[in-house]
UniProtKB/Swiss-Prot annotation:
Keywords: Heme, Iron, Metal-binding, Oxygen transport, Transport
Full protein name: Hemoglobin subunit alpha-1
Subunit structure, as described in the record: Heterotetramer of two alpha chains and two beta chains.
Cystine crosslinks: none
Family that this chain belongs to: Belongs to the globin family.
Expression sites (tissue/organ): Red blood cells.
Taxonomic source organism: Hapalemur griseus (Gray gentle lemur)
Entry annotated with the keyword Heme: yes
């Protein structure tokens, strides 16, 4: 459960990320593919080379997270269609959400060290876990 302090930390951090969200999403996705090669099985048609258009799929990740931040009090409603897509069409193994969350935290910490305090780190970790829970909620 996200506390009011968590929500404030998340909104403030995401505001600082701002226009870099798409780049950070792409970098986190690339990190995930390089660090956890089994995650590439869901993207056999992607060009995995650095800077490829396919790695830019990270923009979709960033857009979904921006949407979740904007609807932080109703993430299940805001992410319902995305949850359906991942559960029923793409059938992504839920563990991959944890892997991507970790890569997002590493990426954000490397680009925003001043803003990435222990409290912000904890809040973002809880937020990514909440998003992952929403995305896997329709797997049953």
């Amino acid at each position: 459960v996200l506390s009011s302090a968590d929500k404030t930390n998340i909104k403030t951090a995401w505001g600082a990320i701002g226009s870099h969200a798409a780049d950070h999403g792409a970098e986190a996705l690339e990190r995930m593919f390089l660090s956890f090669p089994t995650t590439k099985t869901y993207f056999p048609h992607f060009d995995m080379s650095h800077g490829s258009g396919q790695i830019a799929h990270g923009k979709k990740v960033a857009d979904a997270l921006t949407n979740a931040v904007g609807h932080i009090d109703d993430m299940p409603g805001a992410l319902s269609a995305l949850s359906d897509l991942h559960a029923h069409k793409l059938r992504v193994d839920p563990v991959n959400f944890k892997l991507l969350s970790h890569c997002l935290l590493v990426t954000l910490a490397s680009h925003h060290p001043a803003e990435f305090t222990p409290a912000v780190h904890a809040s973002l970790d809880k937020f990514f876990a909440a998003v992952s829970t929403v995305l896997t909620s329709k797997y049953r």
